[in-house]
């Protein structure tokens, strides 16, 4: 994704154009997301091969979603994208709907995966993967339960349904406050990196 973005921007510049991969370049149009697909399985050497760990991985990402948001969505423009044009607003999951933070497509077997829909091109993919792996491993270790799916379109859902759902932070300041209130970033990112994202 990083190489692709660089190549497109270079080719555009050579032709007198500008390629914008920011989260929300046009206020009335869909923004740019950087969906991350996650898969998980025990190896044969673990003695637990065949056990389905994807639900635990999803549970961990949901549990730590708010704390990860300032790194997955590090610019003010990131938050203009949330809640419109199929970008998530709530911390929820479903196999059936693209308005969720995490969608589990209908693939099976080796192709089964969870699609995290909140990250955008402003994020550092290496830090994003670090946090997602850490959240998944934490959840597997602690046995976090997977919440029930929210199998409806959250853009048109009634207020009584959405009132019970946790929301993604609504601004960069809110995201930083959520991260400071928790301990997750302190556990998985070095202090200088943390300070950069939370200052």
Please describe what each predicted stretch is:
Residues 1-26, 30-39:
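Helix-rich catalytic cores of soluble enzyme domains
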Residues 7-13, 17-20, 41-199:
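Catalytic-core signal marking the mid-to-C-terminal active-site face
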């Amino acid at each position: 994704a990083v190489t692709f973005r660089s190549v497109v921007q270079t080719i555009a510049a050579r032709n007198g154009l500008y390629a914008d991969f920011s989260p929300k370049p046009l206020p009335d149009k869909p923004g740019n997301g950087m969906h991350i697909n996650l898969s998980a399985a025990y190896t044969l050497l673990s003695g637990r091969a065949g056990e389905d760990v994807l639900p635990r991985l999803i549970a961990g990402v949901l549990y730590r979603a708010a704390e990860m948001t300032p790194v997955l969505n590090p610019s003010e423009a990131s938050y203009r994208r949330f809640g419109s044009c199929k970008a998530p607003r709530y911390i929820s999951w479903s196999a059936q709907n693209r308005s969720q933070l995490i969608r589990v497509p209908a693939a099976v077997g080796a192709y089964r995966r969870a699609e995290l829909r909140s990250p955008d091109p402003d994020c550092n993919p290496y830090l994003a993967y670090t946090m997602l792996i850490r959240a998944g491993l934490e959840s597997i270790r602690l046995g976090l339960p997977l919440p029930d799916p929210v199998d409806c379109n959250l853009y048109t859902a009634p207020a009584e349904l959405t009132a019970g759902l946790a929301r993604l932070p609504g601004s960069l300041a809110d995201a930083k406050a959520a991260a400071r209130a928790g301990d997750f970033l302190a556990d998985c990112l070095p202090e200088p990196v943390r300070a950069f994202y939370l200052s």
